[in-house]
Amino acid sequence: DTSTIRVGGRGAHLARPAEPTGAGMLLLPMITGIGQRVREFAAELAESGVTTLSWDPFHGVSMDDHELDTMVELMHGLDDETCLAEMQRLLDHMFGELGLEKVGVIGYCLGGRFALLLGARDERLANVVAYHPTVPATPADNHTVDPFEETPRIAAPVMMLYPGQDTIVPHEVFAKLQDGLQ
């Protein structure tokens, strides 16, 4: 069962399992927004019994109907603190209105960076999964929260994966994030 819901005045994609387990994941997408692939990820998690709520960073815009250039421009307009506040409202909704007992966060690329930041900010999280978090060597102008300072504060178990052929995030950055987790 999937639907678009409103939380705090913003849209989010909800995928519910046929047989709920009380577990949930907040899914933070890559630059694609809540496109087809993200909806598929959410459905796969729901099929395993995990209620999945996907944050919509671009408020309805996705690569389903927009070019990469548009998505890059929108990504550069994201404000870290505003995004983190939106994610915390989604977590509140998951624990409150959805009645979930355990919630983790999983993010890809853009969402991987935010998964680490949110993990440092919200102790309610059961786990943090960050697939190839986009943390450039030189922070983007709109990156006002430093993941190197925040990552050591994560209390939940963390799984972070780095793609071997990444051309955006140097291996040294990944190693520094990894050191912060140790």
Language-model regions, residue ranges each:
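N-terminal cap/leader regions of alpha/beta-hydrolase-fold enzymes
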Residues: 1-182
